[in-house]
């Protein structure tokens, strides 16, 4: 199964293991914070975000410029969120953009 994952998906899963169980990982991908898998299923109705799929993987996303309002919705719903930001410029990154929990 791990061989079927893209480098970005492997990066996401590695970062997901760094946060407390049950926390929703908001993963910066370009102009959006994306949520995948169970995080997307849980977060999409709270955030009013459309649940879609990339392959068989559930996902939803919110625009990065509106992050504070979406974080407030998760917190009001009693959820914990972890932010994962791009820590290098995607235009100059060689290969996968480095990301860290911030």
Task: Please report, for each region that a protein language model flagged, where it lies by residue.
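Basic, polar low-complexity surface loops/patches
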Residues: 1-102
